[in-house]
Amino acid sequence: MDSSKVPVKLAKVIKVLGRTGSRGGVTQVRVEFMDDTSRSIIRNVKGPVREDDILVLLESEREARRLR
């Protein structure tokens, strides 16, 4: 697959909501799209992440379920 033709969206982490996953290896965050700052969604992120990080989202429509 040619990665130069995959549309990506840039999103900025505005709030870290908490840890999830069986061992806490996934972090749930609220992100705001760089091109449309009025739109924000919740995503699960694997690996280290903190506020003001920029994420490259290959799939921008999928939203994570909130933690209980």
Curated annotation (Swiss-Prot):
Keywords on record: Cytoplasm, Ribonucleoprotein, Ribosomal protein
Keyword Glycoprotein (UniProt): no
One Pfam entry name: Ribosomal_S28e
Listed GO biological process terms: cytoplasmic translation; maturation of SSU-rRNA; ribosomal small subunit assembly
GO molecular function, one term: structural constituent of ribosome
Domain of life: Eukaryota
Annotated localization: Cytoplasm
GO cellular component labels: cytosol; cytosolic small ribosomal subunit; nucleolus
Disulfide-bonded cysteines: none
Similarity comment: family membership: Belongs to the eukaryotic ribosomal protein eS28 family.
Subunit structure as annotated in this protein's UniProt entry: Component of the small ribosomal subunit (SSU). Mature yeast ribosomes consist of a small (40S) and a large (60S) subunit. The 40S small subunit contains 1 molecule of ribosomal RNA (18S rRNA) and at least 33 different proteins. The large 60S subunit contains 3 rRNA molecules (25S, 5.8S and 5S rRNA) and at least 46 different proteins.
Extra facts: There are 2 genes for eS28 in S.pombe.
Function according to Swiss-Prot or TrEMBL: Component of the ribosome, a large ribonucleoprotein complex responsible for the synthesis of proteins in the cell. The small ribosomal subunit (SSU) binds messenger RNAs (mRNAs) and translates the encoded message by selecting cognate aminoacyl-transfer RNA (tRNA) molecules. The large subunit (LSU) contains the ribosomal catalytic site termed the peptidyl transferase center (PTC), which catalyzes the formation of peptide bonds, thereby polymerizing the amino acids delivered by tRNAs into a polypeptide chain.
Protein name (database record): Small ribosomal subunit protein eS28B
The species this protein was found in: Schizosaccharomyces pombe (strain 972 / ATCC 24843)
